[in-house]
């Protein structure tokens, strides 16, 4: 008899053949995409966040790398905290990102319900809007959850 209560309930008893038990158990425990709503998918994408300020760039043809090891947000599905490191690389054109405002911007994610993928893409979108770089790349390396380690990367252009 399976140990998981949903599997036992779905089988309706112990008289089911072993081959059928496996199939019913898989179906009983299957996570469907119906459990993730459009609201989950869009969570945090249009949230009001602090403005990222800039200052006038004086040089051309160099790269800036900023590593932010204290990224936190909330998973919109589970409500559990997510942790990670955000790495921003860009080549400035006419403006550079002001670091204090960038720090305040990233810390605003702390209580925001947003998926990893949306966070990385939103950060890139806001960085590009703020400083109009020649190119930019945002990489999010997130702490393992359930044995899975996720790295998300978004690029401009």
Walk through the language-model features, giving the residues of each.
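N-terminal amphipathic/basic-hydrophobic helices that include classical n-h-c signal peptides
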Residues: 1-15
């Amino acid at each position: 008899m399976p140990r998981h209560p949903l599997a036992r309930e779905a089988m309706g008893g112990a008289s089911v053949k072993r081959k059928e038990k496996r199939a019913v158990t898989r179906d009983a425990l299957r996570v469907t995409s119906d459990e993730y709503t459009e609201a989950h998918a869009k969570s945090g994408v249009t949230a009001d966040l602090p403005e990222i300020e800039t200052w006038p760039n004086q040089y051309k043809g160099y790269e800036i790398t900023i590593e932010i090891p204290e990224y936190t947000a909330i998973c919109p599905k589970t409500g559990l905290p997510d942790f990670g490191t955000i790495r921003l690389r860009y080549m400035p054109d006419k403006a550079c990102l002001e670091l204090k405002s960038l720090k305040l911007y990233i810390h605003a994610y702390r209580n925001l319900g947003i998926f990893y993928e949306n966070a990385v893409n939103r950060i890139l979108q806001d960085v590009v809007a703020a400083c109009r770089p020649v190119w930019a790349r945002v990489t999010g390396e997130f702490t393992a959850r359930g044995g899975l380690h996720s790295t998300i990367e978004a690029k401009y252009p």
